[in-house]
């Protein structure tokens, strides 16, 4: 994690403007504000925006202990509900559709792969919550799950009778192979593990005395229940497509149309439920958008000077335009882009795990040096290992646009990119890191 924070100016400090509003200033040794007119203007804009609106303007800077929330009885319940609400959304149902429709798995095969993949991915990402670990968002997630789970329960009642839970879907569909099971398992794992890099962003205001193991249980339970439920619902919808003409036509239009068709038995009320299910994806978009603003601030030493709300607004405009333009290609995007994201995330994951348990041996980070590049690792070992990990991903990937030589050499094509990316990175990082420590000393 420290490698990603290299490059920050040690003179960027936090200036208090109120109990919950924080902005960034570039301070010189004589406490005079320096920089270009644009930089000063951005800093002033951030302060004014935070004071007038009350919106959290804090960026990537460390939250001091005296600014954190006091311990409360519902702390771990809030963690549980945040992840439950974030994953109990329609887009995770779409992941489940691909088990029967893309890989030819029946109900039991797809359900086992999905549940195991989701739980494994969630367990790993919540390790980051417990180890590293937004006021309005947290308030929203305390209650959003109620509406979302009621809507999903209505979907089960409406569409459940059409689910085919028999061992084999149809004699016309080829039997699923081991490679199909592994590919779908990897897809479900990828849908969960993609939360890992951002998983600590939402609990920075929690007290430092928060128990890691309780955070792990709360986070993993909430996310696992939500993602397992929604993915299995998607599997059920996919198994019933061939026996329902309306579902066939809807699935040819888009995955979203299939979700709406699952409520068709309820007529007007069903259309209302479909709208509620669609609006529920807000719970999934909020944390992603929040974290993306922090990620943009980490791109360079000047990033923290741009207010996070301004970056967030820019992101929303960009991804809204992209969503409108690409709305007809959601299936292709989910099939191709989700595994691609998992390649770099598992390589990053291998770096973090080995740094934490081999070189730091479970010891905490020195958070006081988070923005001091002279004391942080240079990232040479991490960068070189990451390149090896991506090489492994390229060799083992099996996508519609490219099949790696290792995947192509298998009797049955299977996407091994994620597993090879993790393996290649994990093998070379210890040697590279030892060399970096010996030569550089940090």
Task: Please tell me what each predicted stretch does.
Residues 2-98, 105-107, 179-186, 204-216, ...:
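Membrane-interface "cap" regions at the ends of multi-pass membrane proteins
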Residues 348-428:
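C-terminal membrane-solvent junction of multi-pass transporters and transport-like membrane proteins
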Residues 120-159, 217-219, 338-345:
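Membrane-interface loop-to-helix entry segments
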Residues 111-131, 146-156, 191-199, 304-325:
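Transmembrane alpha-helical segments of multi-pass small-molecule transport proteins
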Residues 126, 130, 147-173, 188-193, ...:
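Hydrophobic alpha-helical segments and their helix-loop junctions in multi-pass secondary transporters
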Residues 76-93, 156-162, 173-240, 264-289, ...:
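Hydrophobic, membrane-embedded alpha-helices of multi-pass small-molecule transporters
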Residues 70-76, 132-145, 177, 194-229, ...:
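Hydrophobic, small-residue-rich membrane helices and short re-entrant helix-turn-helix hairpins
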Residues 121, 298-332, 373-393:
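Loop-to-transmembrane helix boundary motifs in multi-pass membrane proteins
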């Amino acid at each position: 994690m420290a490698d990603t924070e290299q490059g920050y100016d040690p003179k960027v400090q936090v200036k208090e403007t109120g109990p919950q509003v924080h902005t960034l200033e570039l301070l010189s040794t004589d406490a005079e504000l320096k920089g270009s007119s644009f930089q000063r203007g951005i800093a002033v804009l951030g302060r004014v925006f935070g004071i007038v609106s009350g919106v959290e303007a804090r960026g990537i800077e460390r939250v001091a202990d005296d600014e954190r929330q006091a311990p409360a009885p519902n702390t771990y319940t809030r963690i549980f509900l945040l992840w439950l609400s974030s994953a109990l959304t329609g887009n995770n149902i779409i992941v489940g559709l691909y088990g029967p429709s893309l890989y030819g798995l029946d109900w039991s095969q797809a359900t086992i792969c999905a549940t195991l993949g989701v739980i494994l991915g969630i367990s790993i990402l919540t390790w980051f919550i417990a180890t590293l670990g937004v006021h309005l968002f947290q308030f929203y997630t305390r209650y959003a799950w109620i509406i979302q789970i009621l809507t999903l329960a209505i979907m089960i009642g409406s569409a459940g009778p059409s689910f085919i839970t028999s061992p084999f879907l149809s004699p016309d569909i080829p039997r699923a192979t081991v490679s199909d099971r592994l590919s779908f398992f990897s897809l479900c794992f990828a849908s969960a593990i993609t939360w890992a890099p951002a998983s600590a962003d939402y609990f920075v205001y929690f007290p430092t005395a928060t128990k890691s193991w309780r955070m792990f249980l709360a986070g993993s339970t909430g996310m696992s229940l939500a993602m397992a439920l929604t993915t299995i619902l998607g599997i059920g919808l996919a198994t019933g497509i061939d026996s329902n003409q309306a579902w066939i036509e809807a699935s040819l239009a888009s995955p979203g149309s299939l979700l709406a068709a699952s409520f068709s038995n309820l007529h007007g009320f069903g259309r209302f439920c479909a709208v509620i299910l669609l609006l529920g994806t807000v719970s999934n978009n909020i944390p992603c958008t929040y974290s993306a603003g922090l990620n943009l601030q980490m791109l360079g030493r000047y990033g923290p000077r741009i207010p996070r709300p301004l970056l967030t607004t820019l992101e929303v405009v960009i991804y809204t335009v992209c969503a409108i333009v690409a709305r007809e290609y959601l299936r292709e995007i989910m099939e191709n882009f989700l595994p691609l994201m998992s390649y770099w995330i598992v390589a990053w994951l291998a770096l973090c795990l080995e740094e934490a348990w081999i070189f730091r041996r479970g010891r905490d980070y020195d958070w006081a040096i988070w923005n001091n590049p002279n004391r942080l690792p240079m990232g040479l070992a991490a960068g070189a290992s990451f390149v090896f990990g991506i090489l492994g991903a390229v060799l083992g990937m099996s996508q519609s646009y490219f099949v790696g030589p290792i995947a192509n050499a298998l009797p049955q094509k299977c996407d091994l990119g994620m597993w090879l990316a993790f393996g290649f990175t994990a093998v070379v990082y210890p040697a590279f890191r030892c060399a970096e420590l010996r030569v550089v000393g940090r």
